[in-house]
Amino acid sequence: MRGLLQDIPVRGQKRVLLAAPRGYCAGVDRAVIAVEKALERYGAPVYVRKQIVHNIHVVSELERQGAIFVDEVDEVPEGAHIVFSAHGVSPAVVAAAADRGLRAIDATCPLVTKVHREAVRFARDDFEILLIGHEGHEEVEGTAGHAPERVTLVNSPDEADTIEVKDPDRVVWLSQTTLSVDETMETVRRLRERFPNLQNPPSDDICYATQNRQVAIKKVAQSADLVIVVGSANSSNSVRLVEVALEYGAKAAYRVDYASEIRQEWLDGVATVGVTSGASVPEVLVQEVLADLAGAGYADVQEVKTAEEDLMFSLPKELRKDIAGKRDERALGGRRS
């Protein structure tokens, strides 16, 4: 794989422009490892509320290892271990798990937890919260659940034109972490036209990984005839990457879960293929796409890097405590009298 310089070469013979950063973000990596470590520490089954991350390959691999995915905590046997997904949960879900005596491991992404804390603080300070996000998404449900009497959901820029608030001087916007940056800023612009005193969150709610992947695919799309985004249909950030690619110059863009879904007709007359992946996609799936494209004559892979990522999150505290306790038990057991 050749590294790409500042300027992408002009279209020519068959090649792949591989976006970087791509794939797993720190929050997804932490959540997946949390389930794997829980299975290792407690043994199967370990229950997970909702999909741990929005990727069918990851979910099926964890199921193979002994994870059981459920929609709600009342499906979990009393006293069992349950992992809350990276998208976060409401206080009501936490309480329901406690009522069943479940041993909960909270794998909520710390960047989502940050939004939860913002919602609690602004609600406490008597602000109305305009939450920009997609109705029905687990992350939105979790955030809204932290301030249910104060949150109004804004699904799109058009909805910003019709939202009503009680006090336009005490209103703040927050957002789902996986949205299109451009669309979110357009929504905020239109909200501020109606509510000039609209407050911003203390820091960006859209996560670094979502932003970085969108910036990279914008660069790639400018020179691509076709863009392939690896990611699942229910992955908000993967779907947004397809939209961004089309907005920034790609002649066509498609989302696939696996390389086997790439259609030959997509490649007809195509010289440059852009490739990226959503934040919940393991790199092995991208490599399978590259291998498939190489077989079709696209063996020249040029990486388009727009940012470096080195953020890492520690495991959930509940898991760290149990793992540390197990080490202490082993240490004590190994001492000679």
From Swiss-Prot:
GO terms for molecular function: 4 iron, 4 sulfur cluster binding; 4-hydroxy-3-methylbut-2-enyl diphosphate reductase activity; metal ion binding. [4Fe-4S] cluster binds at residues 25, 109, 207. Its EC number is 1.17.7.4. Binds 1 [4Fe-4S] cluster per subunit. The active site is at residue 139. It catalyses: isopentenyl diphosphate + 2 oxidized [2Fe-2S]-[ferredoxin] + H2O = (2E)-4-hydroxy-3-methylbut-2-enyl diphosphate + 2 reduced [2Fe-2S]-[ferredoxin] + 2 H(+); dimethylallyl diphosphate + 2 oxidized [2Fe-2S]-[ferredoxin] + H2O = (2E)-4-hydroxy-3-methylbut-2-enyl diphosphate + 2 reduced [2Fe-2S]-[ferredoxin] + 2 H(+). Dimethylallyl diphosphate binds at residues 54, 87, 137, 235-237, 280. Pathway: Isoprenoid biosynthesis; dimethylallyl diphosphate biosynthesis; dimethylallyl diphosphate from (2E)-4-hydroxy-3-methylbutenyl diphosphate: step 1/1; Isoprenoid biosynthesis; isopentenyl diphosphate biosynthesis via DXP pathway; isopentenyl diphosphate from 1-deoxy-D-xylulose 5-phosphate: step 6/6. Keywords: 4Fe-4S, Iron, Iron-sulfur, Isoprene biosynthesis, Metal-binding, Oxidoreductase. One of its GO terms (biological process) is isopentenyl diphosphate biosynthetic process, methylerythritol 4-phosphate pathway. Isopentenyl diphosphate binds at residues 54, 87, 137, 235-237, 280. Its cofactor is [4Fe-4S] cluster. It holds the Pfam family LYTB. InterPro entries: LytB/IspH. (2E)-4-hydroxy-3-methylbut-2-enyl diphosphate binds at residues 54, 87, 137, 177, 235-237, 280. Catalyzes the conversion of 1-hydroxy-2-methyl-2-(E)-butenyl 4-diphosphate (HMBPP) into a mixture of isopentenyl diphosphate (IPP) and dimethylallyl diphosphate (DMAPP). Acts in the terminal step of the DOXP/MEP pathway for isoprenoid precursor biosynthesis. HAMAP family: IspH (MF_00191). Belongs to the IspH family. This is 4-hydroxy-3-methylbut-2-enyl diphosphate reductase. It comes from Leifsonia xyli subsp. xyli (strain CTCB07).
